[in-house]
């Protein structure tokens, strides 16, 4: 996995530079997300390894219908280098660079039950105060947490779940 990220990093940076130059972050995000999802499918991944599949066919397969010329050239470069399988990692790196440029922290809040909008607003305000940036929250539900929530911003994980507290208590009692 770390090797894939290492190989994908220059392509993620290149995609970001092209999008920044054109001032069109959102279309590139959408296009990369589409291509990453298609490339991540095991059947498509196997097809991409088939030597009978030409570069143009691979680009056509992975490009969204609304893709611009710059994006098609970018996919062509990936195809030339036989790096189309790295599209999920490239898309992830691109999104990290975009969030940094737009001064946004992306956070995933996983809770034991669905949270109200008021609770999410409170968490967003606290995270904005802590990081000094706008916050883009994605929610998930995991009943195994028992109660509370886990907030993951990529670099920082705040585990306020009952499951996490019980695990920490068990660990401290064991030692």
Curated annotation (Swiss-Prot):
Q: Where in the cell is it found?
A: Cell inner membrane
Superkingdom per UniProt:
Bacteria
Predominant localisation class: membrane
Give membrane topology per the record.
Peripheral membrane protein
Name the Pfam families for this protein.
Answer: OSCP
Keywords, alphabetical: ATP synthesis, Cell inner membrane, Cell membrane, CF(1), Hydrogen ion transport, Ion transport, Membrane, Transport
Q: Which GO terms describe its molecular function?
A: proton-transporting ATP synthase activity, rotational mechanism
Q: Name one GO cellular component term.
A: proton-transporting ATP synthase complex
Query: What does this chain do?
Result: F(1)F(0) ATP synthase produces ATP from ADP in the presence of a proton or sodium gradient. F-type ATPases consist of two structural domains, F(1) containing the extramembraneous catalytic core and F(0) containing the membrane proton channel, linked together by a central stalk and a peripheral stalk. During catalysis, ATP synthesis in the catalytic domain of F(1) is coupled via a rotary mechanism of the central stalk subunits to proton translocation.
**Subunit and partners:** F-type ATPases have 2 components, F(1) - the catalytic core - and F(0) - the membrane proton channel. F(1) has five subunits: alpha(3), beta(3), gamma(1), delta(1), epsilon(1). F(0) has three main subunits: a(1), b(2) and c(10-14). The alpha and beta chains form an alternating ring which encloses part of the gamma chain. F(1) is attached to F(0) by a central stalk formed by the gamma and epsilon chains, while a peripheral stalk is formed by the delta and b chains.
HAMAP family referenced in this protein's UniProt entry, alphabetically:
ATP_synth_delta_bact
Q: Which family does it belong to?
A: Belongs to the ATPase delta chain family.
Give the protein's recorded name: ATP synthase subunit delta
Origin organism is: Xanthomonas euvesicatoria pv. vesicatoria (strain 85-10) (Xanthomonas campestris pv. vesicatoria)
């Amino acid at each position: 996995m770390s090797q894939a990220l290492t190989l994908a990093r220059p392509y993620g940076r290149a995609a970001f530079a092209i999008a920044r130059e054109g001032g069109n972050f959102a279309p590139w995000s959408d296009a990369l997300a589409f291509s990453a999802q298609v490339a991540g499918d095991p059947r498509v991944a196997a097809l991409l390894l088939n030597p009978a599949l030409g570069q143009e066919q691979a680009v056509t397969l992975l490009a969204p219908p609304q893709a611009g010329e710059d994006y098609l050239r970018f996919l062509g470069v990936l195809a030339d280098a036989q790096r189309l399988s790295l599209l999920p990692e490239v898309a992830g790196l691109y999104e990290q660079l975009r969030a940094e440029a737009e001064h946004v922290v992306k956070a995933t809040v996983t809770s034991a039950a669905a949270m109200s909008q008021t609770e999410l607003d409170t968490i967003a305000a606290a995270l904005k105060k802590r990081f000094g940036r706008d916050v883009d929250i994605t929610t998930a539900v995991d009943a195994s947490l028992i109660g509370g929530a886990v907030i993951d911003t990529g670099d920082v994980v705040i585990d306020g779940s009952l499951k996490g507290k019980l695990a920490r208590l068990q660990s401290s009692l064991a030692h």
